[in-house]
Amino acid sequence: MKIELTVNGLKIQAQYQNEEIENVHKPLLHMLAALQTVNPQRRTVVFLCAPPGTGKSTLTTFWEYLAQQDPELPAIQTLPMDGFHHYNSWLDAHQLRPFKGAPETFDVAKLTENLRQVVEGDCTWPQYDRQKHDPVEDALHVTAPLVIVEGNWLLLDDEKWLELASFCDFSIFIHAPAQILRERLISRKIAGGLTRQVAEAFYARTDGPNVERVLMNSRQANLIVEMTEEGRYHFTS
């Protein structure tokens, strides 16, 4: 299936194999829907954690689309973690802008408070503006009975991040070999206009350490999905 999706405000051309849709994505969504029916009066919160380059933002947007097409599924809403980046002014004051995207560049306390509001009822959620390169407050109105919070650090085995677990009903981790992610991330930067030399330097400084940290320091998820070199997804056996 070829489909145009709006991901973080940008139009993305995505493609998923029909076999993968039937054997991975639809069964996974029905499993999450079953979780939601256990306590339908309460919002179900799913964490999707993955290293950079695994296509998680596009994937969750595609899941939203699949849920809209299936009357047996509840409405699903994606809540990206990127809206909890510290503002550039804060990053500059702390000399952290070159490392934007690392755990230290996120406002974990703010994320924790927002997750508490998500569990309790209708609320808003910030979104990262990729033109301004800063968060926009109250950009999303959270209304769906099933939400998927996606980001790199949701399962980080670090004291500051452990409190997030109390708001999570089910967690999914997308795994892929670091070398595959390296090539995907460098290619993405080149497609954005950078030379290969600059793209490789960016990977070495920012994306590479983040990939390794997610792969090596994330806590065990309830479900692991593997991404292949071709960008396809399958359940681990």
Curated annotation (Swiss-Prot):
Keyword annotations from UniProtKB, A to Z: ATP-binding, Kinase, Nucleotide-binding, Transferase
GO molecular function list: ATP binding; kinase activity
SUPFAM superfamilies on file: P-loop containing nucleoside triphosphate hydrolases
Database matches in Gene3D superfamilies: P-loop containing nucleotide triphosphate hydrolases (3.40.50.300)
Binding annotation for ATP: 50-57
PANTHER family noted in UniProt: URIDINE KINASE (PTHR10285)
Identification of the protein by name: Uncharacterized protein YggC
Biological source species: Escherichia coli (strain K12)
Gene name for this UniProt entry: yggC
